[in-house]
């Protein structure tokens, strides 16, 4: 089965961020903003390293009590955030998708 890919983008404010997309094109993880493209690339490397490890995920609820999850690096810093899901089961399926697709080495640079 095909893995997803990462997309690096430049925001209007000049900062960089990335999304991890599943093979169906759906965004399954989004990063914070980074001051440089190199920092965003380091963030991708951290997702690639940490995404296979279930212990690096934390299931949370937003203000509407909708479940979502964060992926944390070994230093406990958040390196990616999911969308909101309809149920904890759906969020856990999202974690499983990031665990699989996070290993992708395909990075599409949309800043060029």
From Swiss-Prot:
InterPro entries: DUF1508, UPF0339_domain, YegP-like_sf. Sequence repeats lie at residues 11-59, 62-110. Keywords: Repeat. The keyword Repeat applies. It comes from the Bacteria. SUPFAM superfamilies: YegP-like (SSF160113). Gene3D superfamilies: 2.30.29.80. Belongs to the UPF0339 family. Duplicated subfamily. This is UPF0339 protein YegP. It comes from Yersinia pestis.
């Amino acid at each position: 089965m095909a893995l997803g890919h990462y997309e690096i983008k430049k925001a209007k404010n000049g900062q960089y961020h990335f999304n991890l997309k599943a093979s169906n094109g759906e965004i399954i993880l989004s990063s914070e903003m980074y001051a440089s493209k190199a920092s965003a690339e380091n963030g991708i490397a951290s997702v690639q390293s940490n995404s296979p490890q279930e212990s690096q995920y934390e299931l949370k609820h937003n203000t509407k009590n909708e479940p979502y999850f964060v992926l944390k690096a070994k230093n406990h810093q958040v390196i990616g955030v999911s969308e909101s899901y309809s149920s904890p089961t759906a969020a856990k399926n999202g974690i499983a998708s990031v665990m699989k697709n996070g290993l992708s080495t395909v990075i599409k640079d949309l800043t060029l």
